[in-house]
């Protein structure tokens, strides 16, 4: 059965590739601006549910569709994708030397199974090097990530301690997804 990743995220695509999961990547448009909540957990859940509803429109093809959404929370204040370099700098200032949470809601839908998971990756950060912040902002890489958090490069050397579920921090609960895929295969074979 074909697996479709309903996301344009290169980090999510890389996670699937690293785990040997074959997939096709397709963008699903869901208007996150229509969500009025400022609660990080509620927001990421509703955004993922919205994407899941869009995915249901593609299900006629007898395929498995995976969607996800992530936000960052610092002191329970939500950080989505920064809209400007100034906002990115504000996000990084708030994260500097503090604990961050990356909340990721991952979901899978197939003709016989629907799975949804909300997980949290926590990291305590050291203080950022101001010259590295400037380089990071100039690179533009921050534009791709919720809260400008890039655990795969910029944030990595600043992690003092963290929870074990790095894939959640990178935007997709791969461990949970693998379990759901195995369950889906068992159900399909019945």
UniProtKB/Swiss-Prot annotation:
Cofactors required: a divalent metal cation
Protein name as catalogued: Nucleoside triphosphate pyrophosphatase
Subcellular localization, as worded in the UniProt entry: Cytoplasm
Active-site residues, record numbering mapped to chain: 69 (proton acceptor)
Reaction(s) this enzyme catalyzes, per UniProt: a ribonucleoside 5'-triphosphate + H2O = a ribonucleoside 5'-phosphate + diphosphate + H(+); a 2'-deoxyribonucleoside 5'-triphosphate + H2O = a 2'-deoxyribonucleoside 5'-phosphate + diphosphate + H(+)
Family listed: Belongs to the Maf family.
GO annotations of cellular component type: cytoplasm
Keywords assigned by UniProt, alphabetized: Cytoplasm, Hydrolase, Nucleotide metabolism
Domain of life: Bacteria
Function in brief: Nucleoside triphosphate pyrophosphatase. May have a dual role in cell division arrest and in preventing the incorporation of modified nucleotides into cellular nucleic acids.
Gene Ontology process terms (BP): nucleotide metabolic process
EC number(s) recorded for this UniProt protein: 3.6.1.9
């Amino acid at each position: 059965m074909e697996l479709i990743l309903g996301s344009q995220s290169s980090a999510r695509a890389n996670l699937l590739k690293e785990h040997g999961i074959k997939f096709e990547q397709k963008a699903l448009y869901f208007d996150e601006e229509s969500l009025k909540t400022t609660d990080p957990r509620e927001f990421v859940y509703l955004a993922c549910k919205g994407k899941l509803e869009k995915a249901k429109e593609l299900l006629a093809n007898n395929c498995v569709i995976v969607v996800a959404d992530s936000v960052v929370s610092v002191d329970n204040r939500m950080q989505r994708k920064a809209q400007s370099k100034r906002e990115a700098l504000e996000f990084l200032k708030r994260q500097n030397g503090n604990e961050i949470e990356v909340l990721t809601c991952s979901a899978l839908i197939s003709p016989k199974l629907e799975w949804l998971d909300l997980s949290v990756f926590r990291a305590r950060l050291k203080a950022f090097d101001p010259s590295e912040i400037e380089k990071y902002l100039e690179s533009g890489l921050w534009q791709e990530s919720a809260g400008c958090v890039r655990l795969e490069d910029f944030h990595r050397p600043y992690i003092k301690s963290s929870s074990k579920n790095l894939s959640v921090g990178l935007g997709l609960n791969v461990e949970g997804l693998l379990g759901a895929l195995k369950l889906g295969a068992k159900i399909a074979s019945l």
